Swiss-Prot record:
Transmembrane region(s): none
Organism phylogeny: Archaea, Methanobacteriati, Methanobacteriota, Methanomada group, Methanococci
Taxonomy, superkingdom: Archaea
Family according to the record: To M.jannaschii MJ0417.
Annotated protein name in UniProt: Uncharacterized protein MJ1587
SUPFAM superfamilies: PHP domain-like
PANTHER family: EXONUCLEASE (PTHR42924), POLYMERASE_HISTIDINOL PHOSPHATASE N-TERMINAL DOMAIN-CONTAINING PROTEIN (PTHR42924:SF3)
GO molecular function annotations of the record: 5'-3' DNA exonuclease activity; 5'-3' RNA exonuclease activity
Length: 171
């Protein structure tokens, strides 16, 4: 089964790279599902920053495209970002990682640490070893040089092999 479980839509908000501000994504939900279907991807998770709105909107198109949609969010905590999958409502940003994970699990969701060693994105780093996470992203397409992904892969495979989670499919 092909899945891409870390996708942002136009609802994801404004990102910052140093002093530059830019839309995190400009993708329409319809276009995301059209591309997913074309590539043979069967499941997508919409994980906009601090909102489930994009996931909710994309879920409405699920049957039209025959691609399963998981509603999620990439939530900013006091220490870094955590992805919640299978969410029913927004989780407030700015909570501790522990509180965020608790709120994800209260909804029956999964808590995933995205890009744990990113020098650019807000990352949890070695805190991933102390938290009750369901998975850790070991490949993130934003880090195309491979260095950050290799650090995550090597550390997670060594310490948490059952939680290594490649949540991005790349052909």
């Amino acid at each position: 089964m092909k899945a891409d479980l870390h996708i942002h839509t136009k609802y994801s908000g404004i990102g910052k790279f140093w002093k530059l501000k830019f839309p995190d994504s400009v993708e329409e939900p319809r276009n995301i599902l059209k591309v997913a279907k074309k590539k043979g991807i069967e499941v997508v998770a919409i994980t906009d920053h601090n909102t489930i709105r994009g996931g909710v909107e994309t879920k409405k198109l699920e049957k039209e495209f025959g691609v399963e949609v998981v509603i999620g969010s990439e939530i900013m905590t006091t220490e870094g970002e955590i992805i919640g999958l299978f969410l029913n409502e927004d989780i407030p940003k700015g909570l501790s990682p522990e509180e965020t994970i608790e709120k994800i699990k209260e909804q029956g969701g999964l808590a995933i640490a995205p890009h744990p060693y990113s020098p650019i994105c807000k990352a949890l780093g070695d805190r991933i070893f102390d938290l009750d996470l369901d998975g850790v992203e070991v490949f993130n397409a934003y880090h195309r040089d491979g260095i950050v992904n290799n650090i995550a892969l090597n550390k997670v495979i060594k310490e948490l092999p059952q939680k290594a989670f490649c949540i991005y499919w790349r052909e």
